[in-house]
Swiss-Prot record:
One of its GO terms (molecular function) is hydrolase activity. SUPFAM superfamilies: alpha/beta-Hydrolases (SSF53474). This is Uncharacterized protein K02A2.1. Coiled coil: none annotated. Signal peptide: none annotated. It comes from Caenorhabditis elegans. It comes from the Eukaryota. InterPro entries: AB_hydrolase_fold, Dienelactn_hydro, FrsA_esterase.
Amino acid sequence: MTSDRNGKLKPRLEAALNALKSVPCVDKQKLGAFGFCIGGLCSLDCARYRFDGIRAVISFHGTLTPIEGIPLELLDDNSIQVHHGDADKHVSKVTVDAFHEEMRARNSDFVFISHGKAMHSFTDPESAGIAPSGVGYDANAEKRSWKATLEFLKEAFA
């Protein structure tokens, strides 16, 4: 799915967003997206695709690679917050730097928080049982990232 983000992933993200918008009590112009790992990528892609109504996007230890083949349109109608584990071996420094460059090129309102000592999946207490190396829970990073997220959402939807 992530290898075909324009062909397979984008329509699924749009379908999920449209399902949310169909709920009567939802303000269709004040939507947010957040996710963990691949869900973090999906959240960032909601901003990159400039889906109508998305105002706040949060990624927790998400994949940061840009979408190939789409123009670098301005992202001036939403805010982005990224929580990254500084010891995350699944996302290289080159990829982190490329993400920063992409966000600057798009004139994005973004916050990038690098949690020291935190590895990939730092929010998941069960991650110690996951086979890949470089994955692990970090209570401090989990607590701090969630606290920052709540403040970010208050600001975005004030």
